[in-house]
Amino acid sequence: MKKKIVSVAVIAIAFVAVVLLCVKFKNNTTETGFFAMNTVCSLKINGKENDAVSKVIQAMVENLDTAILSRKNENSEVSRLNGNSGGNIDKKLHGWFSVLLDVCKKSEGKFDFTLGAVSDLWDFGGEARLPDSVLIEEALSHAGAEKIVLENNSVYYGDSFTVDFGAAGKGIALDEIKNYLDATQTKDAVVSIGGSILLYGEKDFTVGIRNPEGNAGSHIAVLKVDGCCVSTSGGYERFFEKDGKTYHHILDPDTGYPSESGVVSVTVVSQSGILSDALSTACFVLGIEKGSALAEEYGCETVFVDENKCLHVSEGLKDKIEISDNSYSFAEQ
């Protein structure tokens, strides 16, 4: 069985997360890149009519971003909901809300997609600043996914709530793309949207886990996986330093400040894009013990990297991972 090699790296350049891919396919392959969902996206498609397939995928991602999920676009569905404290929603949006609310509940609120107002105070995607604690407390008073009421064809939440699909939107896009590829004659594909990747096909893939302290092209370990979705969340993606302290973009919903769970990065492997994306954030904030238990509850595999350069690997990946940087080691079990 031939193997396709994927080297994954997430870096922050001008506050844009970039994933670098190196994939070897046979002939009849199309490669393209574009910008959407506030990040760089890349496609590598192998199959019949791959040029047309690539164009459709790009249009799908751009439409999903601007017309549905973007809270910055005043004409999107999410912006409409935020401006009206909820409203009627279609079946797909209902399904996404349902999944994320379940993750919120099972993570004991450590995953929360109503922190848009808090995130805006930090502005990690722009100037990046340390907000006043009073402003953070005020913003937190207008958050809390547990306050969302999801009904058959509608959703409602409190005044001044800002629902933000940023921690799950890329995974949602991967699920939509996978469903589309299933209906085409595509043999193999690698789709990268920020820190989330769809590995599509029946052959093995080798995925490099980025070195949190190294350059964009370096990795600390390699995973051998079948077709799946892989999402990584790391404090190195977007951050700034002030008075000798580093502030990263992954916020703890309980405090409104960057998580201090002792985790440097989390990689989640799942057949579901939305789960891989949302759980990578949830597990980062929960920490290793509770995060591992949460991922296991959803049938997902994980690799945690802690502050001591130790890798904590779930049972299903232990025979599929090798360390490639000798300064890192596996945690003692």
Residue map of PLM features:
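Mature catalytic core of soluble alpha/beta enzymes
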Residues: 2-333
